[in-house]
């Protein structure tokens, strides 16, 4: 029995939860074929599983899709500490164990892609296929700017998009229902999570770790992407020479919001 993709209104109500370790009860949305190979979807900085909601209907129906809320985001536990990429990655590793998943594909966007890459490098046995959307081995100056700006803000935020347009308000033809709901969920992310995750990014450089990665890998990048530059793509392609690389001309950081059908076509081809 295929599990349907929840619509925008039902997205949060459809979340399931599982205690993955002492600190974290993780919330996730599941759709697709429950007996298919698992595909985990990891969202970006201050997003939630909803980031994949407009892409979901275009993905092939034969896989079991699990879109996670990472720690501190969405409905998942919000510990005081810690929010390094390795913490997100170990949570996903614990989720894979607790759910008893095998032959797992991990798709990550932005922060989620770095999480996916670190997971596949540190636990190569747990990830059979890897998709890195708008990724990098280390982050650039955009994050310092976000950090400095968040530091001066009063929380709760009333509108993050005035300063975090790069992340929050990806320009394009994205699903307005998804964008509106996602913005509300981003506003709910506590200040310590915004700041801790941003500090965590500043220490990440998984170039050396990437040599342990064995998963078949696909990298997706839009050439209008401001946070993740072309030189960052050259670096990761040098580190992962076997990876397939697809460039979307005229698309930005969240190209799967701008044209979900286009991106789903490439994902479905890779997941075959």
UniProtKB/Swiss-Prot annotation:
Reactions it catalyzes: atropine + H2O = tropate + tropine + H(+)
This protein's record includes keyword Hydrolase: yes
Superkingdom to which the source organism belongs: Bacteria
Active site: 110, 253
Pathway this chain belongs to: Alkaloid degradation; atropine degradation
AB hydrolase-1 domain sequence ranges: 38-260
InterPro entries, A to Z: AB_hydrolase_1, AB_hydrolase_fold, AB_hydrolase_sf
Family: Belongs to the DmpD/TodF/XylF esterase family.
Note, other: The strain used in this study was isolated from the soil between the roots of belladonna (Atropa belladonna).
Listed name of the protein: Tropinesterase
Species this protein is from: Pseudomonas putida
């Amino acid at each position: 029995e295929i599990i349907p993709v929840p619509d925008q209104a039902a997205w949060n109500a459809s979340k399931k939860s599982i205690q993955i370790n002492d600190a974290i009860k993780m919330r996730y949305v599941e759709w697709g074929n429950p007996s298919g190979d698992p595909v985990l979807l990891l969202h970006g900085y201050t997003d939630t599983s909803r980031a994949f909601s407009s892409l979901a209907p275009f993905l092939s129906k034969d896989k079991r899709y699990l879109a996670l809320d990472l720690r501190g985001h969405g409905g998942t536990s919000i510990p005081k500490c810690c929010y390094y990429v390795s913490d997100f990655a170990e949570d996903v590793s614990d989720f894979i164990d607790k759910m008893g998943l095998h032959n797992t594909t991990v798709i990550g966007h932005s922060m989620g892609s770095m999480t996916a890459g670190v997971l596949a490098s540190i636990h190569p046995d747990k990830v059979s296929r890897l998709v890195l959307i708008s990724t990098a081995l280390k982050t650039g100056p955009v994050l310092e700017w976000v950090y400095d700006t968040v530091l001066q803000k009063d929380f709760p935020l009333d509108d993050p998009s005035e300063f975090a347009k790069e992340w929050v308000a990806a320009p394009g033809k994205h699903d307005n229902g998804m964008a509106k709901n996602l913005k509300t969920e981003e506003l709910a992310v506590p200040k310590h999570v915004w700041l801790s995750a941003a500090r965590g990014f500043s220490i990440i450089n998984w170039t050396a770790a990437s040599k342990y990665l064995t998963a078949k890998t696909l990298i997706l990048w839009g050439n209008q992407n401001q946070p993740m530059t072309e030189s960052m793509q050259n670096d990761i392609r040098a580190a992962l020479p076997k990876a397939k690389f697809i460039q979307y001309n005229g698309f930005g950081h969240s190209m799967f919001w701008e044209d979900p059908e286009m991106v789903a076509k490439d994902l479905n081809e890779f997941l075959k």
